[in-house]
Amino acid sequence: MVEVKKIKLTALERSWILYDIGNSAFILLVSTLIPIYFYSLASDGGLNESLYLSYWGYAGSVSTLLVAVIGPICGTLADHRGFKKPIFMACMLLGVLGCAAMGVTAGWLAFLIVFVLAKVGYSSSLVFYDAMLPEVTTDERMNTVSSMGYAYGYIGSVIPFILCLLLVQFGDKIGVGAGTAMVVSFLITAVWWFVCTQPLLKRYRQTAFVEHGGNPVSSTFRRLRDTFREVRQQKHIFLYLLAFFFFIDGVYTIIDMATAYGTALGLDTTGLLLALLLTQFVAFPCSIAFGRFSAKYDTGLLIKICILCYTGITLFAVFLVSQWQFWVLAVLVGMFQGGIQALSRSYLGKIIPAERSGEYFGLMDICGKGASFLGTTLIAMVSQLTDGQSFHVFGLELQNENIAVGTLVVIFAIGFVLFCKADKLNNTIS
């Protein structure tokens, strides 16, 4: 058995991980307080629970679809010398400014528009952040560093979130109204994200790149076209990206829709927030554990285990009707969320050329964001089409929202089958 050794992080690796701590504060807010805040705006605007869940799902779908379109283009452009850091910084600033601006919007529609812009900035920045990984660390350390990014992102993002949660829950004790508390929460998160980005901007230097070769814009589209052709010929990469499209769909959809799902089912708001806070604490050690497991066990095997466990989690969520079940769901998600994300990222990083990481991670982003578009859209559509209906399954009365979540089971199953084929082919090639 291989001995697992602790590694000492370099300054660049620490700076890279710190960005995960910064942007994770935003996504934690998106998965907890923001859906509840939008619910109050939607209720004031006359929307019922099913329409609220549908419009929230559609907003997530629009943002992910936009990133799926622009991500590969920007990723390929960023592979040119000197382009990666400036484009990364621009996307980060769009997310930070959008986050800060969400607190000053009037009405549910304006809020959704600003939310989409902030989510596009966040998701786009991750294309370049992920593409930095092969330059930030070595191939041998990639699984561990990737896992630590997610792990410390989960636990570090709790710091600003607790401040925001205390302000929202108890702000009235010090004369701060609910609306003002949310405005301040958006500002706290935006500042945290911006500050945590600065060390990476200072230390990162693009070491793997392609030369401009003329106009970088026209070269970008030419190389993107060539990459699509190459991926179709490299069956092991093509199958992996196709599998990733499906299995990561369920992961991202659960992250995006968890609070909205619980709110639509009428579960206690405070209980939902505390349960999702628990997810962060559970995800921290479990993400690190998966990074260490990858030194002893095959990465492909670990990803397969995560996919199967997520399939079981989704089946459990279909029958969720009470608060305690949501707490169990939160713990189960925390156990596997960071592992499957980190290992999927490093798995691709090991089978692609480092100097073209931007374009390949851009393609990965098409798959990830395109999948998230599929998942949130399916849930939104099923929820809207079955508005007001209830279903009796195994003696339980389930709401239409429960049935909508069940669509993810099929998507996980397809992803598992495709990944098994891709991993078998990758093992043959290596």
What are these regions (language model features)?
Residues W192-R203, V405-S430:
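Multi-pass alpha-helical transporter architecture, strongest
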Residues V2-E13, R205-L241:
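Juxtamembrane intracellular "pre-TM" segments in multi-pass secondary transporters
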Residues P86-A100, L301-F316:
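Structural signature of the two symmetry-related core transmembrane helices
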Residues K6-T64, H236-D268, L272-A275:
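Helix-loop boundary and gating motifs at the non-cytosolic
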Residues M102-F115, V318-A330:
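Helix-loop junctions at membrane interfaces in 12-TM secondary transporters
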Residues E49-S50, V168-A190, M381-F412:
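A membrane-interface helix-boundary motif in multi-pass transporters
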Residues V69-G82, P285-T299, S383:
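Helix-to-loop junctions at the C-terminal end of transmembrane segments
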Residues S146-V168, C367-T376:
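Glycine-rich segments within core transmembrane alpha-helices of 12-TM secondary carriers
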